[in-house]
Amino acid sequence: MDKLDLSTKAQELRELLGEDANSPVDIFSLANQIEGLTLVFYPLGENISGMCVRDQEMKLIAINSTMSYGRQRFSLAHELYHLYFDDESGFNVCSKRLDPKIENERCADQFAPYFLAPYKSLRAAIKKVAGNGAISMQHVIALEQYFGMSHLAMFWRLVSEGYLSSDALEDYSSGVMSMARYLGYDDKLYKPTPAELQRRTYGHYLKQVEELRQKDLVSSGKIDELLLDAFRDDIAFGLDEDDQGGEAID
């Protein structure tokens, strides 16, 4: 596994998707802009973090919506590696526990933190929050909040860069959410998607359904059926009501 090559790939993909080399990214918005990509959020169970399916006819990424928001962001970055750089398979089901024997999974797991927190940006952020001193638990939380990464992902990233020791994992893993709140941060990063929103589809599939609707190629009942298949009852049953008021949304 070539870490420099993976870091370079992460930078290249950020640029391809219209992001600069250093800023924190709204990775879900970026994914929604990828031509032909359907993004599905679904409770995938205790063992699966996500999956990527790609061939000449479709591109699909699924994310386990019962994981924390920070872990979902990491998993999406992981799946983007499979989508753009993994030539071994067109179908990847990714376990929450990394199998070190599977090279493309190791590469995807290394790619993800490089995409979310590029090296130069991470180094600058560390300098800002910790100066030249040791990195404390509070500093780790500040960094993960800035880059939108799960606590463990940020901890291991700092270990890989030599800022922390893996022996400190237990000391840095207790009371994370309560400390984040105490420090004034939103705790969204550490929580799963609310139960009522854990089944959702975005991206290309919905654009295709809308194209069918605009061209009047299928019945309104069929449109509703397609939307319900994508867990978008909010659109199937709420779109007309939302539009009738004519109120501008700020």
Model feature map: region roles:
Residues 1-250:
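Active-site hotspot residues in diverse enzymes, especially metal/ion-binding acidic/histidine motifs
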